């Protein structure tokens, strides 16, 4: 009986790994009815730029770009997107910008964002955005480098497993980032005396 269990163990491990990898994506997408690869959780990518806020797109007004679906509030936004999609596609495949400098692909809610030099960055929370803004330019440079050299074409689960196991040298925990925020700006929810540029 023990021999059977031992011989089954590698197969069970393989099945577990395959189950974990199933559904992995190189982009942060969700499934919503007829749109199994929905970007930005259905928010209009153009509205972040033109309205300065996250706005849910109409499921009837949509476009495909690089294998994913984007929804729009109106046809004019869809046309703007289709004319220059690179202007509106979110940085880092729609994953959280605060994970990018650590070569991590963290999920986002799509409502917390910042536009820097015309580029859309998304965050999982206001706190992660605040931490990222402390060293915004460095975080963009690191995030861009890791995205192109390592994370862009890797599925998020194996990538995150790898980088949580083998962290980049400059990795900081949320607690360390919050302590740095407090050291620089005071209490946790205080706005900085001088807002980071961007």
Predicted features along the sequence, with ranges:
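Bacterial N-terminal signal peptides that target proteins for export
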Residues: 2-13
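Beta-edge loop/turn motif
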Residues: 74-77, 125
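Intrinsically disordered, low-complexity terminal tails and linkers in eukaryotic proteins, enriched
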Residues: 24-66, 87-198
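Short, well-structured hydrophobic secondary-structure segments
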Residues: 67-74
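Bacterial N-terminal signal peptides
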Residues: 12-23
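N-terminal non-cleavable signal-anchor helices
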Residues: 7-9, 18, 169
């Amino acid at each position: 009986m023990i021999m059977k269990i031992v011989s089954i163990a590698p197969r069970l491990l393989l099945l577990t790994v395959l189950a974990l990898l199933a559904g992995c994506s190189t982009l942060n997408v969700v499934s919503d009815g007829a749109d199994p690869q929905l970007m930005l959780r259905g928010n209009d990518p153009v509205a972040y730029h033109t309205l300065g806020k996250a706005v849910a797109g109409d499921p009837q007004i949509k476009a495909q770009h690089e294998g994913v679906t984007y929804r729009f509030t109106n046809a004019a936004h869809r046309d703007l997107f289709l004319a220059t999609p690179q202007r509106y596609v979110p940085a880092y495949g729609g994953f959280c910008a605060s994970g990018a400098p650590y070569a991590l692909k963290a999920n986002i809610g799509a409502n917390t964002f910042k536009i820097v030099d015309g580029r859309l960055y998304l965050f999982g929370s206001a706190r992660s955005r605040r931490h990222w803004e402390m060293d915004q330019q460095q975080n963009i440079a690191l995030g861009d480098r890791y995205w192109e050299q390592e994370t862009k074409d890797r599925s998020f689960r194996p990538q995150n497993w790898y980088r949580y196991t083998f962290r980049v040298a400059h990795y900081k925990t949320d607690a360390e980032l919050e302590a740095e925020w407090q050291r620089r700006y005071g209490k946790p929810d205080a706005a900085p005396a001088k807002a980071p540029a961007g």
